[in-house]
């Protein structure tokens, strides 16, 4: 029994699928070295050593998850395929809490695929007063609150070199790998430029960390060549990929899935997601209608329901002085 994992499950009130996913993570990280191979002056020798390291780590993983065929990145990386609405963000919080409390890992880098999710993640991880704060109940984070570093404040970040504070960097993928344009000229992304405060770029700072873990929200967005290359260059000790769509841009399934709880399972369980209601006619008989005619009828019915609902909402707004 893993006491730390069980405590996190209870404190965060994890749903059953999320608790199962956390259990998988605990077994996997016990198998991994969670360290980078030593750097070598001979780059060719270093590349060979790193390839051997990855193969060895994959073999260890297969002892727990034989269906994990490949990391798909230049570092150990696991995909959690979990249906939308189950709580992938909460699982990320649970994973961070476990890796910190059980393994002493202090540096985490979270990637968001767009501005909307970036802003949501900043609040989920950085606002203890927020009702959906992901670490609510983790007492260790009350006395040692995580330092949240974002794509907006990383150049002004303080306490980066604290010996015991957990650091969570949250970046929108566009700031992470998109070339900047100043004066009409393309240049390196700002996070790759020299920071006077750090004495190096923030990217180089992350690369230099011996315990960096990267978490990818909507991970299917980061399998394109540019994103994948930029992430690989960070060389973290571990990657955790969260997605409800575990396929790449070519439609191929991920080879590094270690846990799956898909929409079909969620609908069958009937506990966590709403079952969609489909508008249909009472006592409807298809008769001699063709497939095309039937599709048109379905669309017309859907439009009718939409207009009916819209009318009721407008009436409600007028009657209650709402915009």
Predicted features along the sequence, with ranges:
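Conserved SF1/SF2 helicase motif Ia
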Residues: 81-82, 86, 93-119
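Conserved interdomain linker/interface between the two RecA-like ATPase lobes of SF2 helicase motors
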Residues: 254-323
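Conserved RecA-like ASCE ATPase "motif II neighborhood" in helicase/translocase motors
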Residues: 150-230
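Conserved Walker A/P-loop ATP-binding site and its immediately adjacent core
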Residues: 104-136, 142-143, 174-175
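Post-DEXD/H (motif II) to motif III coupling segment of the RecA-like Helicase ATP-binding lobe
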Residues: 223-275
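Conserved nucleotide-binding/hydrolysis micro-motifs of P-loop NTPases
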Residues: 115-118, 174-178, 220-221, 245-249, ...
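Conserved pre-motif I regulatory segment
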Residues: 1-81
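Phosphate/oxyanion-binding active-site loops and adjacent basic polyanion-contact surfaces
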Residues: 13-22, 84-92, 117, 255, ...
């Amino acid at each position: 029994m893993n006491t730390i994992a069980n405590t996190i499950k209870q404190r965060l009130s994890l749903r059953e699928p999320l608790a199962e996913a956390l259990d998988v993570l605990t077994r996997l990280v016990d198998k991994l070295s969670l360290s980078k191979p030593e750097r070598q002056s001979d780059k060719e020798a270093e590349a060979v050593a790193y390839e051997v390291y990855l193969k060895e780590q994959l073999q260890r993983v297969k002892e727990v998850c034989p269906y994990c065929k490949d990391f798909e990145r230049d570092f150990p990386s696991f995909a959690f395929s979990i249906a939308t609405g189950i709580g992938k963000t909460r699982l990320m919080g649970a994973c961070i809490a476990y890796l910190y409390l059980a393994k002493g890992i202090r540096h985490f880098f979270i990637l968001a695929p767009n501005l909307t999710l970036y802003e949501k993640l900043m609040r989920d991880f950085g606002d203890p007063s927020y009702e959906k704060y992901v670490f609510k109940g983790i007492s260790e984070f009350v006395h040692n609150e995580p330092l949240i570093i974002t794509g907006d404040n990383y150049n002004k970040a303080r306490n980066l070199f604290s010996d015991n504070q957990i650091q969570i960097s949250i970046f929108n993928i566009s700031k992470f790998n998109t070339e900047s344009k100043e004066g009409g000229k393309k240049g390196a992304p700002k996070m790759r430029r020299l920071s006077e405060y750090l004495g190096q770029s923030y990217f180089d700072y992350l690369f230099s960390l011996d315990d960096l873990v990267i978490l990818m929200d909507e991970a299917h967005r980061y399998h394109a060549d540019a994103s994948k290359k930029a992430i690989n260059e960070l060389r973290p000790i571990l990657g955790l990929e969260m997605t409800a769509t575990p396929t790449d841009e070519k439609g191929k399934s991920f080879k590094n899935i270690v846990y799956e709880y898909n929409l079909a399972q969620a609908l069958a369980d009937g506990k966590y997601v709403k079952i969609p209601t489909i508008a249909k006619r009472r006592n409807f008989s298809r008769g001699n209608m063709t497939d095309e005619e039937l599709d048109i009828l379905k669309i017309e019915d859907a439009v009718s329901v939409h207009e009916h609902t819209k009318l009721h909402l407008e009436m409600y707004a007028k009657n209650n002085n709402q915009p």
